[in-house]
Curated annotation (Swiss-Prot):
Co-factor requirement: Mg(2+); Mn(2+)
Binding site for Mg(2+) 1: 308, 312
Comment text on domains: The Asp-Asp-Xaa-Xaa-Asp/Glu (DDXXD/E) motif is important for the catalytic activity, presumably through binding to Mg(2+).
Coiled coil: none
Name of the protein this chain belongs to: Sesquiterpene synthase Cop
Source organism of the structure: Eleutherococcus trifoliatus
Sequence positions that bind Mg(2+) 2: 308, 312
Assigned EC number: 4.2.3.133
Note on cofactor: Binds 3 Mg(2+) or Mn(2+) ions per subunit.
Length: 556
């Protein structure tokens, strides 16, 4: 375990001499002041020529979408969604899919068309039957081998299988069938199809982040010289770049706020990851109307990240009890017995919520929203404290003890509650009551978050001397190997995705935009915790993701 002796002076000094503090040796901020150079960008104040060009392109795309025949419309909707501009045509897409759901037959259509229609309808909450795929099976209940000659259809079927729910054996068989054939054939294909297959096997459409997938699909789409729609392509490029400028301006504001807090100096043991936090929340919602929501949620996840390090790495149990009590009471009193750096953190935390309360008052939103958010944050730090007690008392919890705590300390119930605060009239009091009661979709998201995090991070955390993860708990309790645990956890993650899919089928308890936000949070985890802890170790794959979405524009 790496440790150091905290000196008796400076921002993190305490009244207790020579307390041994742990250090996780996180790498420093890799971005510096890079994002401070960007100016605030208001889309409504785009120059007149660009605004008119954008309007004309949008009207042309809308006309094509409305006038298209059924199958052409299917493919156009798919392209619009994958190019990241579906938010511009929500009413038209909803109307088209509603008509398709009413007349969904599919008996005479090919594999690609049926698979695509199924995927788009499921994606928008329509509970269409997976029995439509039985026509592609032989008398033995297996998918016909002749289908592999239709690679486009096989790829479309593969993408459709990721919308399966519990009990859909036909889609389980379809996933196995398509995956095996695509894996076998991928090295023999030419671009752009090869790139699509490789991308799909790594990250199916259903699990991808909007901005990353849009940037990638723009590059794929423009390679399809014979089939791509130049108007749609130009519109998607312009839309991406305009949104990127807006996002750069937002990140500049966030970076300036973070720099003024000066946590890098005042809390040097904590991860300095505010850019990564913004990227995380950009994956939750990217649309212009959610600017305030992004700003608030980015600040909250940044504060939660620092709290995680205070509880995991820095604080003594006595200090953490005092800090937790102060957060529970939500006041600045009785903090003299903890280090100055914790007091700095606590003041900054309260300021974030005060800022949000002022924003709610300014926009005429009810104040109860921030109350729900505060309660969710209190619940989070209670679980941080429970884990800190396990560590400092050298206690190895059972899996049954670990999971109820760890599913909350993973932060996704807290984030789900906070994500609603800035979402306007969509987030009713009933919606806050619903999310606060930890519904199935939030539980499933938390399972994916916790198990993914533990699988990629448990070895480093074990070396650091942290409390046992779900991996160690399972290995010890059931006497199995690490690889066997991974297999079991992947099954649980797969089942959690099915739970989430089920919760998004009509009729839903809350509106689809609120469910989509929770789904998007899970998509971020799927990306960042795929091969490693891409948040903590952000100087590899995550750096490339952020560069692609927030620095490099699309070439017009």
């Amino acid at each position: 375990m790496a440790t150091y002796l905290q000196a008796s002076s400076g921002p993190c000094s305490t009244i207790v001499p020579e307390i041994t503090r742990r250090s996780a040796n996180y790498h420093p901020n890799i971005w510096g002041d890079q994002f401070l150079k960007y100016n605030s960008f208001d889309l409504s104040k785009t120059d007149a020529n660009t605004k008119e060009h954008f309007r004309q392109l949008k009207e042309e795309v809308k006309k094509m979408l409305v006038d298209a025949g059924p199958n052409q419309q299917l493919n156009l909707i798919d392209d619009i969604q994958r190019l990241g501009v579906a938010y511009q045509f929500e009413a038209e897409i909803d109307a088209a899919l509603q008509r398709m759901n009413v007349i969904f037959q599919g008996n005479d259509d090919d594999l690609h068309t049926i698979s695509l229609r199924f995927r788009l309808l499921r994606q928008h909450g329509y509970n269409v039957s997976s029995d439509v795929f039985r026509k592609f099976m032989d008398n033995n209940g297996k998918f016909k081998e002749c289908l592999i000659s239709d690679l486009r259809g096989v790829l479309s079927l593969y993408e459709a299988t990721h919308f399966r729910v519990h009990g859909e054996d036909i889609l389980e068989d379809a996933l196995e069938f398509t995956t095996s054939h695509l894996e076998r054939l991928k090295s023999h294909l030419k671009n752009p199809l090869a790139a699509q297959v490789i991308r799909a096997l790594k990250c199916p459409i259903h699990k991808g982040l909007n901005r990353l997938e849009a940037k990638h699909y723009i590059s794929i789409y423009q390679q399809e010289d014979d089939s791509h729609n130049k108007v749609l392509l130009n519109f998607a490029k312009l839309d991406f770049n305009l949104l990127q400028k807006m996002h750069q301006g937002e990140l500049s504001h966030i970076t300036r706020w973070w720099k003024e807090l000066n946590f890098a100096k005042k809390l040097p043991f904590a991860r300095d990851r505010v850019v990564e936090c913004y990227f995380w929340i950009l994956g939750v919602y990217f649309e212009p109307q959610y600017l305030i929501a992004r700003r608030f949620l980015t600040k909250i996840i940044a504060m939660a990240s620092v709290a995680d390090d205070i509880y995991d790495v820095y604080g003594t149990l006595e200090e953490l009890v005092i800090l937790t009590d102060a957060i529970e009471r939500w006041d600045m009193g009785a903090l003299d017995q903890i280090p100055e750096c914790m007091r700095v953190y606590h003041r900054a935390l309260l300021d974030v919520y005060t800022e949000m309360e002022e924003e709610m008052a300014k926009t005429g939103r009810p104040s109860y929203r921030v109350h729900y958010a505060k309660e969710a944050y209190k619940e989070l730090v209670r679980q941080y404290l429970a884990e800190a007690k396990w560590f400092q008392e050298d206690y190895d919890p059972t899996l049954e003890e670990y999971l109820p705590v760890a599913l909350i300390s993973g932060g996704y119930k807290m984030l789900a509650t906070h994500s609603f605060v800035g979402m306007g009239d969509l987030a009713t009091k009933e919606a806050f009551d619903w999310v606060s009661n930890n519904p199935l979709i939030v539980k499933a998201s938390s399972v994916i978050c916790r198990l993914s995090d533990d699988m990629v991070g448990h070895e480093v955390e074990h070396e650091r001397g942290d409390v046992a993860s779900a991996v160690e708990c399972y290995m010890k309790q059931y006497g199995v190997t690490k690889q066997e645990v991974y297999i079991e956890f992947q099954k649980q993650i797969s089942n959690a995705w099915k739970d989430m899919n089920q919760e998004c089928l009509h009729p839903t308890t809350v509106t689809m935009p609120l469910l989509t936000v929770i789904f998007n949070m899970t998509r971020v985890i799927n990306l960042l915790y795929d091969e490693e802890d891409g948040y903590t170790n952000s100087n590899t794959r995550t750096k490339d993701f952020i560069t692609s979405v927030l620095i490099d524009p699309v070439q017009i």
